[in-house]
Amino acid sequence: MRLPTLRQLQYLTAVIDEKHFGRAAEKCHVTQSTLSAGIQDLEDLLEVGLLERTNRKVLTTPIGEEVADRARQILSLSDDLVDLAQAEKNPLAGRIRIGVIPTISPFLLPRVLPKIRKQLPELEVLLIEDQSERLLVQVENGTIDVAILAFPFNTRNLNYRVISQEPFWVALPRQHSLSKYESLQPHQLPINELLLLAEGHCMREHAISACQLPASAQRRSVQATSLYTLIEMVASGLGITLIPQMAINSDMVRHADICLRPLKQDSLAKREIGLVWRPSFRRTSTLEQLALSFAEAMDETSD
């Protein structure tokens, strides 16, 4: 029985991802005719149509979507085989793809990447920034190997390890009435002034939990797409927000015309930071070193 080749599966997923034969061919480093022939051979082998070809765009058939999903899993397992062999020869070398959420990446990566380069000089690190749920999907389908997330968050059947926790701080307009206090309790925060990130950002859920917001207040709250936007809105006097401790010494915050106050230490307004990876990802030495590097960087943000 003839089986699809990995190359054919790569061609198919590339076309579906790029939605364009030319860009897919460039991604696969082949000519467009070679890529088209490879996909045609795959369709002939499976005896189903995977793509609908028009003059303007590429459409995927329903069975094509299902085949592509399985193809990504197969390609991911194939990558894992190569990684496993690489880890046997040199556990701390090779390539690793890391996803990081937007409320961590700008504050932690500048600290942690120099550590990784120093401690793991033969490791090639590829980075992607995205929201938690989309990063989990990418870990599951093998697009990335590890995700750096904030918890609590449902990691489904993936492995995870918490490496640190950090408290939230309150960002206030400088003339706000709460600025006279050295620290604050969550119950002191005026709910009607609280600015939150939009749905899909896990820090939104953490802030809601920390402040024990009722559902009605959650719907009323202004929603922003980035922490930078929230900080600028606070500086303009439009409300207050919570920011993670790792952000308080960043240029974004230090140069903003705002007042920062910690939430009291006995408060539950904290988040945990950790790594998430597939059970089939066996490069334990690399994971251990990554966890150590990120934990060290987290410690530095609390100084």
Where are these regions (language model features)?
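Hydrophobic hinge/microswitch elements
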Residues: 131-144, 149-150, 200-261
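Alpha-helical linker/hinge and terminal dimerization helices associated
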Residues: 45-46, 67-89, 290, 294
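A late-sequence structural motif
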Residues: 108, 259-302
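Secondary-structure junction motif
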Residues: 193-214, 283-293, 297-301
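A short LG(V/I)-centered, amphipathic sequence patch enriched
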Residues: 43-60
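Short helix-boundary/capping micro-motifs
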Residues: 13-34
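Central regulatory/effector-binding core of bacterial HTH transcription factors
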Residues: 93-156, 224
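Beta-alpha-beta core module
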Residues: 155-162, 166, 181, 188, ...
